[in-house]
């Protein structure tokens, strides 16, 4: 991408929100646009980063046999009444946006258990069709009374939600474990330390649930994590009258070994049992031709929260002043930003074309109205992990490639530059 095409707004880092600095940088750049509280439009950088996260999720789910589908965002009231959740979501919890016209009454999907159960029952009439896992990635809507934290708690957001179908409780638990492993692989590839945490089932229902929490000072949750066993629990568990028995069931024997973290929830998994299949009267035929309810699970990952967490957790400071952020190389939508002095435009454009031809996404800062110093500063507000400056120090033989997070500079022979980014550039 040529930076002149982005029409990036000029910003002053001293004016940035001190609490949600990374997301506020994008807001002031114009890469996030707030239509009203909790409702955003997304620029090129955010969309590209979202696609990267999406592709990682798709790869990890597909390799485990999950099938990508798509359900409607506009869902009829009648299917939510089948599961007895319409009043729960529109009156008791007041979570769902609804609309009513001459065609009927509808809700904008905050989740899709009803659609998934109907869809699955139509395709999975027999035990021979099981197990199956369907997933989608798309926009969801929730009536957050107090939207806050930019993309940490908005009213519209992009989510991966998956739904599994099994013939028995035992098989459901195996699928649940399979999805747990998929989640851990996804978060590892994103460079996020995740703490699986025992969860409340809430309005989703079911018997067992867990959250996937990431440590961040901006989080709203406080968990206690057992590093040895890899088990997290909510802080309020310590106030339970039967806490020792509860912790023992989880395998936690030494409370003093638990470490406290402020976290944000990036994903959750639920063992639903037969809740939806039974309430919606949707069954499969077992080996004896008898109608049996599906044992289901549901699974969610918030893509917007992941991106917000990645940006906020990778902020850069210089002399205690905010400098910007640097995304991990493996997920950055643009791997390197090329800056040049006027007399070196041809060399910079040649390098840019060379990288693009080898599918190494680069930003060429071709703006004419800014000095080289200001253009270098802008590398950090775009989160680009590598930077090449072509100017008077350029010897025509080597490129100086700077890691924007560490400041380490590699001298790379011109003939080796593609190989560097394909192999060595990922070592951050």
What are these regions (language model features)?
Residues 1-428:
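NTP/phosphate- and nucleic-acid-binding module
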